[in-house]
Amino acid sequence: MSGAPIRVVGTLGTAQTLAWASSYYLPAMLADPIARDLGVSAPTVYAAFSIAMVASALVGPWAGQAIDRRGGRIVLVSTSLLFASGLGMLAAAQGLWTMVAAWLVMGAAMGSGLYEAAFSSLVRLYGHHARGAITGITLIAGFASTVGWPLSSWMEAQFGWRGACLGWAGLHLVVGLPLNAWLPKAAAVSKPEIPSASNNAHVQSSPPASEPKQQVYATALLAFVFAATWFISTAMATHLPRMLEATGATLTAAVAVGALIGPAQVAGRLLEFGFLRQVHPLLSARLAALAHPAGVAVLLTGGPAMAPVFAILHGAGNGILTIAKGTLPLALFGPQGYGARQGWLMMPARVAQAASPFLFGLALDSWGANALWLSGGIGSAAFGALVVLRARSTAN
């Protein structure tokens, strides 16, 4: 695992599976019963979830800086407690505002306990050798929806949605917390650094505007790439069946095609682990960024018969890009100050993720299948940004 023990990858990957299954993938199974019980609409529940995503964006830089200073173990252990608290609050919610408060706590947990925190923890432990471990984490946690959706559905059927939330909270306390506590302890540092041309620019409590212009430019490009690709990923996750129906596919076919995306994501990550890890992450990111626009072109040209090709291209590209969000900043900027930088890089992405379901839904309502030109255009812009980023990196 490129310098990281398999035990660490397995431990953190399992904890990440639990974290994703009980947060990001929770509304898909519980939004409707929560809405019925609290007397609100399902879109209101999703709006509260979007607020949680914005909260996670605000927490991310702080969590990253804490990991840079103290290592990931203490942050991730604290996050297990936050997840349990948020889920417990959600289980006890009696109305709109108590539900929103619960999702705000969940947002704080997500901002300090999902992939960005896990990647930062690995980089803090293993530095430049963390790439293989980052890939391994995503391979394991890529099954979060496969585990989370059936388990949430079963717990809701057996114990109600409140019991399901309490069940997830209990799992964080008896499984997630011990797993995170099992991570190696990183040596504390007094003040983490973000590498610069002189290698002495310190992490600030604001975006790294004091860095040399080249690094500021590269950081802005990466932030755009991550925001663009998160927008696409969330839009497809939310609207894929309806979008495929707009191209002429039947509902049955759309659901069947949607089932291809998960395996395609895993296949993409295996491709990264087996072959693309030998090349610079910029190359694998560029190939992955092209996958969605290529799938859009195939689907709009060939019609619903080409929907499986679209799903495979989109899924594989998305799987590789998930890894690139961890490996690309490491390759471009190095391990110093990685956590804080990752927090700032992902802040626009989390906001885009929160807005994506609503904005792409509007486009789909207004334009039908032609809304794919929007996602394809955004994906092409992300590819272009990666090309420019490579050119500038090579030039210097």
Residue ranges and their predicted role:
Residues 7-42, 59-63, 149, 234-241:
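Extracytoplasmic
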Residues 27-31, 215-267:
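Extracytoplasmic gate region of multi-pass secondary transporters
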Residues 58-96:
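Conserved MFS/SLC helix-loop-helix module at the cytosolic interface between two early adjacent transmembrane helices
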Residues 59-71, 268-281, 364-365:
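Helix-to-loop junctions at the C-terminal end of transmembrane segments
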Residues 112-126, 320-333:
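Intracellular juxtamembrane helix-capping segments at the cytosolic ends
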Residues 137-188:
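Helix-loop-helix hairpin linking two adjacent transmembrane segments in secondary transporters
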Residues 145, 335-367:
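A late C-terminal transmembrane helix in Major Facilitator Superfamily
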Residues 259-265, 279-328:
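C-terminal transmembrane helical hairpin of 12-TM major facilitator-type secondary transporters
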